[in-house]
Amino acid sequence: MEENKEFLLTQEGYDKLEEELENLKVVKRKEVAERIKVAISFGDLSENAEYDEAKKEQAQVEERILKLENMVRKAVIIDESKIDLNVVTIGSIVKVKDLEFDEEVEYTIVGSTEADPYDGKISNESPVGKALLGRAAKEVVEVQVPDGVAKFEILEIRR
């Protein structure tokens, strides 16, 4: 994990991180501690699979908590009211036309922490995200993809 990296987030993305962090601290920690307690009650810890599994889960939970705390501490929340609708920026919702397949697709450009391609949220660091940033409606962008070059026409930019 990069110690000095800022995490660009929308307010929605920040709220989700806060919610996950709270759940891990308040709910998951207690669940894992209870599982450890039960596993200890089984006796001999040297051959106690339940104990080993619970301790591994505890380590994973604590690692995730530390990671989320770092992300929340270094979060930079994008002020969506200040998004320039003339060019693509983080927080923009961009409708593009794939010129090869003649299909329209809509992407929300987000920081890498929030990226979820299945939900149409692509990272500003992804090949498509990078190509769209700073571009205006009606422009055609070319993106290097594994199969060659994809061409997209920017149809609309909104927030």
Swiss-Prot record:
Instruction: Tell me one GO molecular function of this protein.
Output: RNA polymerase binding
**InterPro entries reported for this sequence:** GreA/GreB_C_sf, TF_GreA/GreB_CS, Tscrpt_elong_fac_GreA, Tscrpt_elong_fac_GreA/B, Tscrpt_elong_fac_GreA/B_C, Tscrpt_elong_fac_GreA/B_fam, Tscrpt_elong_fac_GreA/B_N, Tscrpt_elong_fac_GreA/B_N_sf
Key word Zinc-finger present in the record?
A: no
Task: List the coiled-coil residues.
Answer: 2-77
Q: Which Pfam families match?
A: GreA_GreB, GreA_GreB_N
The protein's matches in Gene3D superfamilies, at most eight in alphabetical order, are given as: Transcription elongation factor, GreA/GreB, C-terminal domain (3.10.50.30), Transcription elongation factor, GreA/GreB, N-terminal domain (1.10.287.180)
Q: Which GO terms describe its biological process?
A: DNA-templated transcription elongation; regulation of DNA-templated transcription elongation
Could you list this entry's UniProt keywords, alphabetically sorted. Answer: Coiled coil, DNA-binding, Transcription, Transcription regulation
Family note: Belongs to the GreA/GreB family.
NCBIfam families to which the protein is assigned, alphabetical: greA, PRK00226.1-4
Give the protein's function. Necessary for efficient RNA polymerase transcription elongation past template-encoded arresting sites. The arresting sites in DNA have the property of trapping a certain fraction of elongating RNA polymerases that pass through, resulting in locked ternary complexes. Cleavage of the nascent transcript by cleavage factors such as GreA or GreB allows the resumption of elongation from the new 3'terminus. GreA releases sequences of 2 to 3 nucleotides.
Its protein name is: Transcription elongation factor GreA
